[in-house]
Structures are given as C-alpha cells and as structure tokens.
Regions:
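Preference for protein termini
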Residues: 2-210
C-alpha cells in the first residue's frame, strides 16, 4: 500500500473537522510546516527545518504536532484530485491544522463555474484600479500573486481580496479586457516554475505571511 493510499484510509476513517485551535490554556506552541513536492524545489531558498516533502508529511503520524497550533503551507507542484498535493491538504485538515490551500479552495479553483460567481464583485474594483495604469492599453495580462501580494500597487487591494477568497501561496490570475476589464481565469502557480526575480518576491511575501 502506498503512502497516499494508506493516509487516504487514515483520513477517511476520521471525521474531517474544520481547522480549529486549542484555547490559550492548552495551546503550548505554534509550528509552521512547509510542504514541497521535492527537496530541490526549495533549493533557491535558505534551508529550513520547517520544510518537509509531501511524501514525508503523508508518512508522519502527526503525533509530534499534538497540542500545537500548526500552520501548513502546501507548495506541492500540483493539487489535482487524489494527487499528493490534494492529499496533503486533506490530511492537514483531518489533523486540525490550518492549511493553505484548503481542500475547498482546491476544489473551487478546478472549475470556473465554481469560482466565477465570487469574482463578479471584483470586476468593478479591477476596472477602477486599471483605468489609469499602464496595463489599460493592453488587451490582457497574467498576474502572479504571492500570499495575496503583488508589486503592482493599484492592484494590491484586489490581490488581497482574491487571497481572502482563495487563500493559496501562489495564484496566477488572468485579466482580459472586453467591454471593460474582468478576471478571465484563476489557477494555481508552482514554486518550481518561478523565475529568479519571482523567487525574491515569493520569499518576501512568505516572510510577511509566516
């Protein structure tokens, strides 16, 4: 039995609770866990004892985190259904850890029909933000967000709102202009595909988030 299959059994035999935290009298400490698909995905950053591979996280019993407030950042290369990334978020929630992206976010971003309605109110914000920006002369562009942050100041408020709706470490947001600006699509970004300049932005945003 593979690690993924074994931990699917572990998760399926539990009641999946919402991420909850111990009260102040019982909370002993907090812990950050950063999950990567492969160790080399973290090669551009400082070594950290917070880093574990997806395989390691799935094979751990979770006993070491008992009594701790745990934040999990899932940076797997893919969150496809029944893949390692999906199982890591599923298992984190089963253990009571706070994880991004959540299983709900993973499910919603797989189909625009599920997340499209949440974007309707943001189109007005987008139109106002881009009305006097350099991008106003283009037909479209894709913006990469890191923990809800962007270097494009007029779009920072929109980036924050998107992160509040779809909390995910890296998001690729496609903007198009057809009789006004709108969000054409949103998909997950991947750590191992970032350029060098993007790696710096990601690192700064991660520091601010964690």
């Amino acid at each position: 039995m593979s690690a993924v299959q074994g931990h699917w059994r572990e998760v399926s035999e539990q009641t999946l609770p919402a991420a909850t935290y111990l009260n102040d009298s019982t909370r002993t400490s907090s812990q950050l866990i950063i999950i990567v698909e492969r160790k080399e995905d973290w090669a551009s950053y400082f070594p950290s004892e917070d880093i574990v591979t997806a395989q390691e996280y799935l094979e751990q019993s979770g006993d070491r985190e008992q009594g701790k407030r745990v934040q999990v950042i899932n940076l797997c290369r893919s969150y496809k259904y029944l893949g390692h990334g999906y199982y890591c978020s599923l298992l984190a929630e089963a253990r009571g850890h706070k994880v991004i992206p959540s299983v709900r976010t993973i499910s919603e971003l797989t189909r625009k029909s599920l997340y499209g309605l949440a974007l309707d109110d943001l189109d007005k914000t987008l139109e106002k933000a881009l009305s006097h920006h350099a991008y106003s002369d283009t037909e479209g562009f894709t913006l990469t967000l890191y923990f809800g942050k962007t270097n494009i100041e007029p779009l920072q408020d929109l980036a924050r709102q998107l992160f509040e709706i779809f909390a995910c470490p890296i998001l690729l947001v496609e903007f198009r202009r057809t009789n006004g600006w709108h969000i054409e699509g949103i998909k997950f970004g991947a750590l191992h595909k970032l350029r060098e300049d993007q790696e710096d932005q990601f690192a700064h945003s991660l520091d601010s988030f964690s």
